[in-house]
Amino acid sequence: LSDSGSITFSDVDLTNRPEASKATHSISALRSDGSTSFDLTQDQLADLTNAFSISTVAGATNSGTVNWDYSILESQLDFLAANETVTAVFNIVITDNDEQTATQQVTVNITGANDAPVISASNDNIAGSITEGSSLSDSGSISFADSDLDDRPTATEDTKSVSALRADGTTPLALTSAQQQAIEAAFSISTPNTNTNDGSINWTYSID
């Protein structure tokens, strides 16, 4: 993710050899409503600041061009939810031989996009086994995380498929509608905490 531009400068003192430097003027963030501000962490501020760079002025002239570039990894902006914005303002300062300065501000506007939540689980937590006549229940859990810090994911469940085999392990066994409904109804999940962007969901399979 990048953008770039340039500014030009000139000094009427023909023997001056101006130099360019940069400084961060301000960095602010707003929620998607466009008016509610929120704080950025030190790491986020560092990433947003370090993304701005300028070229070096050629030293043998009293006038010239300074190119600026803003380049940041998409992963460094994952904390922004859809339509949240960051406004980063930087100063490019031209300084001559007599320490006289001229300043040009560069404003970079960044708009967030929605990032999908990520699910993680070990194999023993996403597979269950029960045997008729003994244990008739099993359980496990999965974890989830959403990089959009103000997102509040919810969880739902549905049945992808139900299949049955005879004792030989290969011959399909037809289930009645009631049997299939009972098998599906035995699966349930917990409700995740709605006050966080990450957490865990417990699942249970229990059949009579």
Give a label for each model feature.
Residues 33-110, 133, 171-208:
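Acidic, turn/loop-rich segments in luminal/extracellular domains of secretory-pathway
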Residues 70, 114-121:
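Proline-centered linker/hinge motifs at extracellular inter-domain junctions
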